[in-house]
């Protein structure tokens, strides 16, 4: 099994992590280990990297790719559990944390995973294959209102109501089992003139279902705060997002952690006692260069936001 994954914003991420050779770093989304391999190159034997992934295929491939390194610990888990993971490893604080929230190239390119609307496969979309809940359960189990809600909110799809209606109508005849069956339903629901414009008509709906299956947005807010709590002073957190929903959450959470004061604006001094935990390094997100876009088109929607822990 070959886990091909071209890391996005690699140089920008490594630069912004401010890697110390004896530091401890966490790659929350190990994936193809593109970012991790570059971190490890910059660590001494006293440094350490913790690589977390909920996808066993990714961990297996990464362990093979990084087998020469002895200062690396693999963890099969969701990065939302970062506090517990580090506590179990007897690690109090770390120097840097990276999270690349995109679906890996491998997951998209491996048809059987069901992430892609370009290949026919069972409706799956589980990043953690140990989980029992899959895209099949969403498509065949959610009522019309709930389907509409996730497609609208997570996919930002203007035809969410029609798509939800068409899904429910189709599954009343027989279960919807495959990605291509779902693609056909989506295409039928979207008026022809809109199908001919812009990205693939199924893109937004597939994104929405994937987010729901893996509970991606629900865990992000808390995970950012937990991650910041585990950073040393001047430690950095780098988060790469791939759609506006994630980016908005990261941006707003960073702002909240930089300026948590809840006092009314007309009070001359803070009395709520909430102190800033970070300073935002990237006022605007870092995006892929024109050069990177040429060799890695999947970087087109990537945005990197960086924050630094401050002394409390």
From Swiss-Prot:
Reactions performed catalytically: cytidine(1402) in 16S rRNA + S-adenosyl-L-methionine = N(4)-methylcytidine(1402) in 16S rRNA + S-adenosyl-L-homocysteine + H(+)
Entry's EC annotation: 2.1.1.199
One Pfam family recorded for the sequence: Methyltransf_5
Keywords from the UniProt entry: Cytoplasm, Methyltransferase, rRNA processing, S-adenosyl-L-methionine, Transferase
Coiled coil regions, renumbered to chain: none
Record flagged with keyword 4Fe-4S: no
GO-annotated biological processes: rRNA base methylation
InterPro entries in UniProt: RsmH, SAM-dep_MeTrfase_MraW_recog, SAM-dependent_MTases_sf
Compartment list: Cytoplasm
KW tRNA processing (keyword) present: no
GO molecular function, one term: rRNA (cytosine-N4-)-methyltransferase activity
GO cellular component, one term: cytoplasm
Binding site for S-adenosyl-L-methionine: 33-35, 53, 79, 100, 107
Function: Specifically methylates the N4 position of cytidine in position 1402 (C1402) of 16S rRNA.
NCBIfam families: 16S rRNA (cytosine(1402)-N(4))-methyltransferase RsmH
Recorded family membership: Belongs to the methyltransferase superfamily. RsmH family.
Protein name, per record: Ribosomal RNA small subunit methyltransferase H
Provenance organism: Clostridium acetobutylicum (strain ATCC 824 / DSM 792 / JCM 1419 / IAM 19013 / LMG 5710 / NBRC 13948 / NRRL B-527 / VKM B-1787 / 2291 / W)
């Amino acid at each position: 099994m070959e886990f091909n994954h071209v890391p996005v914003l690699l140089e920008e991420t490594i630069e912004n992590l401010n890697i110390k050779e004896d530091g401890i770093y966490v790659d929350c989304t190990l994936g193809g280990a593109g970012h991790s391999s570059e971190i490890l190159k910059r660590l001494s034997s006293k440094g350490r990297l913790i690589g977390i992934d909920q996808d066993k295929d990714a961990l297996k491939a990464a362990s093979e790719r990084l087998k020469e390194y002895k200062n690396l610990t693999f963890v099969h888990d969701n990065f939302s559990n970062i506090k517990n993971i580090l506590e179990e490893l007897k690690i109090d604080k770390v120097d840097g944390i990276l999270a690349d929230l995109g679906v890996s190239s491998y997951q998209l390119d491996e048809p059987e995973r069901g992430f892609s609307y370009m290949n026919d496969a069972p409706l799956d979309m589980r990043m953690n294959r140990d989980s029992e809940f899959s895209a099949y359960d969403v498509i065949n189990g959610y009522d019309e209102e709930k389907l509409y809600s996730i497609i609208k909110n997570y996919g930002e799809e203007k035809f969410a109501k029609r798509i939800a209606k068409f899904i429910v109508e189709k599954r009343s005849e027989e279960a919807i089992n495959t990605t291509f069956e779902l693609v056909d339903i989506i295409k039928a629901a979207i008026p022809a003139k809109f199908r001919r414009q812009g990205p693939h008509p199924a893109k937004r709906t597939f994104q929405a279902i994937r987010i729901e299956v893996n509970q991606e947005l629900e865990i992000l807010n808390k995970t950012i705060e937990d991650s910041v709590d585990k950073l040393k002073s001047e430690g950095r957190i780098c988060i790469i997002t791939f759609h506006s929903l994630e980016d908005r959450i990261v941006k707003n959470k960073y702002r909240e952690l930089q300026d948590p004061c809840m006092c009314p604006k007309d009070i001359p001094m803070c009395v709520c006692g909430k102190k800033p935990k970070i300073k935002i390094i990237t006022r605007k997100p870092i995006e892929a260069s024109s050069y990177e876009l040429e060799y890695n088109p999947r970087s087109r929607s990537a945005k990197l936001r960086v924050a630094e822990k401050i002394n409390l």
